[in-house]
Amino acid sequence: MASKVITNSGVELSSAYLTKRRAALVIAVLFFALICAFIISLSLGSEHISLANILSGSLSREQEVIIFGLRLPRIILAIGSGAALAMAGAAFQALLRNPLADPYVLGVSSGAALGAIVGIMFASQFSLARPLLSFAGASAATFVVYLLGRRGDDPARLILAGVVISTLLGSLMVLLTTLADDLKLRNITFWLLGDLSSGSSEFIAFLFFAVAIGTVTLFANSRALNLMMTGERDAFALGVETNRVRWIVFITASLLTAAAVSTSGAIGYVGLVVPHLVRLASGTDNRLVIPASAFAGALLVLLADTTARTAIAPRELPTGAITALIGAPVLVYLLLGKWKGRQGETATGRRGEGEIISSALWNSRSVAGQALLHLNNISFGYSHQILAHINLEIKSGEVVALLGQNGAGKSTLLNLAAGKLLPNSGAVLWQGKNISEFSRREIAQQIALVAQAEELHFPLTALEYVLAGRFAQTAGIGFDSPLDIEIALQTLAATDSSQFANRSFDQLSSGEKQRVVLARALAQQPQILLLDEPTANLDLAHQFSLLELVRQLAHQHQLGILFVTHEINLAAEFADRVALLKHGKIIALGNPDEVMTADLLSNLFETKLSVNHHPTTGKPIITINTGNIN
């Protein structure tokens, strides 16, 4: 694209790299701090051992027993359990788009604790019974909370479900402990408050096996988690196999929680506090948040446990009580709505001019008039029929407008065209092949769906939001390349949004958000663009500029465009063809002059309309008459 389009692209690229360097610095500092805390913790306890002796290896036999037999296993448990809980919290928060979704609040820790108590009371003779039953309890709690809380995609409902399940499981734990003898009751009570003093080699092995598996699995899915933070609807449209990612992350986070709780007891709030502090320091990218959370969680629990065993030595404090003293105030802070996270800086470059995207960056893969997407006699419905025998073909280089009243099935038709829904009969064909044969990533490489912007629960800049559109076109878990950033900046400029690049998405107006959503779709570099009410919340000037951009994309870059609108005159002005949808059936399809007649439009909208023609362009101009059709 010509350099005049974005005068601040160098600034934005530098800002993106600065963010990565900042995050890398955070991880390096945490790693160094963890090493220092590890060494210092070895020296602290009821019997002090000098650091010089530890580092030089000049230890007495008694000191070797203390270091290697008592302190080192405990320190390893603290590091492993802290890393596990922090990563589980980061994963739950990203997946569920809820900053309060840590294993404790969600009831996952309670499920793990209940399973562990069952293991302590009834299967203590089996060394792995406690971790395995703990994992089963965590998984069951996660599954039930998800089923109860995810309906309607309401974060408050999810938290409420977690509180209910946690309370229920807590009651079951109380009932079980009444059956325990005095010795088991004492052990269970102290363990529930966080106990790292009794970990066996089997428990340590299980914990670090879980941490290793969890780290690799969560990091491998970290790019998908970035998209899940914008909402499952958007993530699915951008190429994420949301069902697969959801269950992988759920199972992994449950494994991490179970491993930590079964080996170290109920150490609370680590999964809540640590990810937030990490995001505050390094941003919201889960490729950085997950490893940084592991180091920070390990550091927090190690420091808490060191304090627990040294503050009133030789007596000990429960480690979980110390982490709760840190976590509870943070939870109150979040509930009061004070959390804002790291906000993007205001962009310094000038306002974009809305020019079309560079041909050098948008390599057209089709020729004008080529049939791209074919809705072949599709019907769809649930308890009642929504669409019936729809036949519609979208060709490269054309703009098709879909008109109809509310409830006619327009959005359902778009979701079928995007592969989000499967028809009850008929087929959606992409260049002659059934769309169901393609993966979500393959579909997102060809088809972009633009819906209304969803509310975000984590601070993302507009540039970060648009970069999510590059998911389908890039492989692996690497960071955004200079080309990805350049394409994102160009799509922001094309939608007249470059001045928003470093602003928080949630700080934008509804119309500004809608333009950024379109920029994200363009960053997918699709061949088909499906737009659901693209001009909603836009002022008149931006309605025209956006649809002019859409027309240019079709005519200059051979995209196929299908857009839903209630703006009849905008459809007449910008569409090459118009489809009229009434009660789930297409009643007319053709160029605007053929379709946009007074009779057809009046029948469609059940309102008397008049059609005139522009004296220069000859395009239809629709006005409303008084009175309704009887």
Please report, for each region that a protein language model flagged, where it lies by residue.
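Conserved catalytic motifs of ABC-family nucleotide-binding domains
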Residues: 525
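The feature captures the beta-strand-to-loop junction immediately N-terminal to the Walker
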Residues: 403-405
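Helix-to-loop junction immediately C-terminal to a conserved catalytic motif
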Residues: 418
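Alpha-helical transmembrane segments in inner-membrane proteins
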Residues: 2-344
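Conserved ABC ATPase signature
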Residues: 478, 504-508, 512
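Catalytic Walker B motif of ABC-type/P-loop ATPase nucleotide-binding domains
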Residues: 529-533
